[in-house]
Amino acid sequence: METIGRNDACWCGSGKKYKKCHCHFDEKLKELQQEGHIIPSHDMIKTPEQIEKIKESGKINIAVLDYVAEHIKAGVTTQQIDDWVYEQTTSRGAIPAPLNYEGFPKSVCTSVNDQVCHGIPSEDVVLQEGDIINVDVSTIYHGYFSDSSRMFCIGEVSEEKKKLVDVTKECVEIGLENVKPWALLGDMGHAVHMHAVENGYTVVKEIGGHGVGLQFHEDPYVSYVSEPGTGMVMAPGMMFTIEPMVNMGTDEFYVDKVDEWQIYTEDGKPSAQWEVQVLVTEDGYELIAY
């Protein structure tokens, strides 16, 4: 951690003297580091100005998912969902973050039934009664990023699938309950994992949450198969996603060999995921996108 004089300008760019801004914050982090904890770097801490701009992006992300929620039904193709997302995002002066990201060809990820994540929208994928689908929307607005996803049950779904969707949402809610300043990401991830396991499910180990806001994917990586007492300290100003991928069967998966994007459960059983973008605050958390 860089050394700054107490009367110097604070590293956060507020224009305030360090002693009246982040001095106590850094002292708290240093104390936790000396106790053996992993602490965030300054570039993981969003400034108040950045937070306000990211919130504007988040509002668009929420509005786009709200539109999808109003229109999704049996008979809709996942390509139609992609069209909606593109139109609803660009009409608000924003850009779909997935489009052309590392070669991803579409504006949204649409993962149906046994697709764990990164489902590519297609005219050939027609939603059927009984399907479950994750729609993962990410937005760039004036250079600031937001990211969240929701599950949708198409018509009447089986009790098994409905329970998976509901428990996965509960996992995210439990994650939020464990977002507290100076607490550990590992404790939060462990609580999420345990709720899934207690309901007979598995959680994908290799894919987790991530920092977001100034870039699409930032540090820290947030595991949802973690041990208590481990992981980075959650400090006010940190922003990341809570997005466990919960499987009805095995946690093993495979990647489509043709497109190298779409991920499926190894046993063909359903997978579910809800995603929220959260800001750590002085007294808990604030939802940025959901």
What are the residue ranges of the model-derived segments?
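Conserved N-terminal segment of EGF-like repeats
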Residues: 1
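Active-site neighborhoods and metal-handling regions in enzymes and metal-associated proteins
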Residues: 5-8, 14-290
